[in-house]
């Protein structure tokens, strides 16, 4: 049986599509004309849908806006507890025989059990009249069924989050319609099933959700079975990850699935001003979790744990708070139905005593989303937005390297705001187009980039904009671009991804421009580091900054870390006489980082169950590219294979390369018909790429000088006059030095000479 087919394929299959944003909260079932005719349904008829994953939902039949057959869209506003419509990954289609037209007579009275927002407890905890009014408003003109749950639409105001239908008359019918004459009452017994919360889509968090679900659902649902088996289950879980990746959202979703009462507390909010107040607040929160556990499984979520439990030092108040939390965590292990979940973006700042078994037994790391995960997140966010069919979410995912879930939400919100402002002038119904997302990119930067040292917002450069150097371009693509884009082929051939590349050659030969083009083609982060970013008057600060740069680059992978003019940052250790030179210490840190660059176990994201997910894991590394025009002063340990695997010589352009560079430089320049780029290329021997661009600039300025500001063309005579003033920056002696530099050293990884 195909994994996406219905288990009862006796009827026509309808493909289950995501709900249109305009139909949220309407309780509609969108069907094609053929399906409506087969059911004999009229507009607004009540339809009961039996779901493949169990449960059912009650909707009203409505035609699809595009009139297409073979598709179905559901709004499960009224469904049985635990029913899963859009969350199923194993089934993507429904048999038409699962849709049943049911009678829906008006109801005289209905009894409901309300689920209040903010976990207010029993209905009597708040004004009964206000709760009853909110329940009547939620049920008005809706078909309902006994035992089903009516969930408030997303974003709807009011006290009530959901209503359990616990009674109604007449009861023999499978469904009934709540009319203005229907008497709604609060009564009955609360259902034994977990009180539902609005479904939280987990775009890009599936693997972390599986890990957390495994740790939480077993002790919460099967505590006695685990005790009988003699298994000690973890009572505490620590979530670690950068801000905005969805730690809180993940906990809420898993708590909903496990049917647990969630008590979410921000740790900084527990801080008190007077002595002992913080400890008192912490004890009160744990006591509240125990009270909730008396009614069923309870989950205590402590956000920003590093603010509450930093590493203990000489400050007595912090030590007392940490000791109190440790005592309460040890006591919570005796409460079988209380699970404590902590979240932090600084796990190293926590006191080590918290992270031992028996307290926070397990740690679940949520990293910056990968390409596949960003696409899933964008699909979840835009499913509620009217986006144009021209918007390519895959392309947006490629453009959002380093964006976390909160950044992507802000990006979509900014695009929606731009579309709204644009629609006031052109149309009544705003539609988010590709241009709106491009405008939003100007205002929304990824949060993981905001504190990165040396991060550059580079101007995109295409390979075609770099004249000549075809052999060098191919070598760079093979060394860096191919491993990022075709990792499966590399593994099949037994190849490993290079860790680093050294570009060396005369000044002005496009070393930096080549790296910019490489970063553009690979769609990766680009971090450029110079000596000014590293060196500090304080001892040990430079080494710390370099380690921080590598750590931040790994958090923004795939990334290219560009060490421009590396000779000014590092030197050869043999040239240091004191043995404690700062460049020598920085070199030591760089060598250690190069040996350790790659995918750490705690940073792993995605799985290897498919080729695309394997590519996500393979790309979790930082590519080091260094550039210098003085390779003779570099330490030989840096140049061995395994660190800077490839040493590529960037030669000055030959005749063909100079002609290509001149064409690129004069592409936007109004040159006259008498200009012969072929002759200019022949006359510019020993000119670097920077020299040729300077030559074209001087010729254009000379044309303005001779013909005034009204000059329209640059003629051949202007180029010839500029040749008399612009001299080449290279010589035969310089070229011979670069070409023979590594030959005598015997390096096997030098290319391009």
From Swiss-Prot:
Q: Which residues of the sequence carry a binding annotation for ATP 2?
A: 505-512
- Keywords carried by this UniProt record: Acetylation, ATP-binding, Cytoplasm, Cytoskeleton, Deafness, Epilepsy, Hydrolase, Intellectual disability, Non-syndromic deafness, Nucleotide-binding, Nucleus, Repeat, Ribosome biogenesis
Task: Give the span(s) annotated as Required for interaction with AFG2A and CINP.
Answer: 1-189
Keyword Cytoplasm carried by entry: yes
Sequence positions that bind ATP 1: 241-248
Q: Which PANTHER family match?
A: AAA-FAMILY ATPASE, ATPASE FAMILY GENE 2 PROTEIN HOMOLOG B
UniProt similarity note: Belongs to the AAA ATPase family. AFG2 subfamily.
Q: How does it assemble?
A: Part of the 55LCC heterohexameric ATPase complex composed at least of AIRIM, AFG2A, AFG2B and CINP. Associates with pre-60S ribosomal particles.
Give the protein's function.
ATP-dependent chaperone part of the 55LCC heterohexameric ATPase complex which is chromatin-associated and promotes replisome proteostasis to maintain replication fork progression and genome stability. Required for replication fork progression, sister chromatid cohesion, and chromosome stability. The ATPase activity is specifically enhanced by replication fork DNA and is coupled to cysteine protease-dependent cleavage of replisome substrates in response to replication fork damage.
From the Swiss-Prot or TrEMBL record, give the protein name: ATPase family gene 2 protein homolog B
Species source reads Homo sapiens (Human)
Organism lineage reads as: Eukaryota, Metazoa, Chordata, Craniata, Vertebrata
